[in-house]
A protein has these predicted regions:
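Boundary/linker segments flanking structured domains
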Residues: 1-51, 59-65, 76-218
């Protein structure tokens, strides 16, 4: 049976696409969603200078993640000042911050490394982290890191951003495939969009026999 989850959201400037802080009931971690143009305004929030990890993202036309960068911060939103000067791609920052007891240096280092590895595995978007952290996650810390990442993944999903591996979410019920006319393709429909999966193939040397395409071709002669 699925477990219900309660979230509290504050829209700090009264706009649905403005600065938001999100807290899951009984969690020690707070999420801050910060549009880049509002970075200076976000610095005025209480608790936003705590340690944690963050995502810098840009979106495509469908409001899905197109590019992503993941980092750690020991002083909260102040870390974004460097990225505001040096990284041009991002439009929004999403920060996951907590107190020092929850997010020790080892914890945020392990969480950063884990999140970057998951982003590469997801194959959903371009990951801007050119160097993977060499931090080795202690086996005793891993269960807590996985638990925190699961919460991060859930919060991101509530904001419309899927972090999970695309192929791991597929099953026979929602996967479609075709092998006709030189095409070997697999895809999935999520209720809104149809996405062709990586590895699909099409033989471009085969002639198109579509009646519709032939009519279109004749109409432009």
């Amino acid at each position: 049976m699925a477990i219900s989850k309660k979230l509290e959201i504050i829209y700090h400037n009264g706009q649905p696409d403005g600065i938001r802080s999100i807290r899951r009931h009984l969690s020690t971690m707070t999420t801050y969603v910060i549009p880049r143009p509002l970075l200076s305004e976000a610095k005025k929030l209480s608790g936003i200078n705590r340690p944690g990890i963050y995502y810098l993202i840009s979106e495509d036309e469908d409001n899905k993640i197109a590019q992503i960068y993941i980092g750690q911060t020991r002083n909260g939103v102040v870390r974004l000042d460097d990225h505001n000067r040096t990284k041009g791609f991002w439009k929004k920052a999403i920060m996951f911050l907590a107190d020092n007891k929850t997010f020790s240096l080892d914890m945020i280092s392990g969480l950063e490394a884990y999140a970057i590895a998951k982003a590469h595995d997801a194959k959903r978007y371009k990951v801007e982290n050119s160097v993977n952290p060499k931090y080795e996650i202690d086996e005793y810390d891993l269960p807590l890191i996985e638990e925190v990442y699961e919460e991060i993944q859930f919060i991101m999903a509530t904001q419309g951003y899927k972090l999970d591996n695309l192929k791991s979410t597929l099953n026979e019920a929602n996967t479609l495939h075709t092998t006709r006319n030189g095409i070997l393709a697999f895809g999935v429909y999520d209720g809104e969009h149809f996405e062709v999966l990586e590895g699909s193939e099409i033989d471009m040397s085969r002639k198109c026999h579509s009646v519709t395409m032939e009519k279109i071709g004749r109409a432009h002669v």
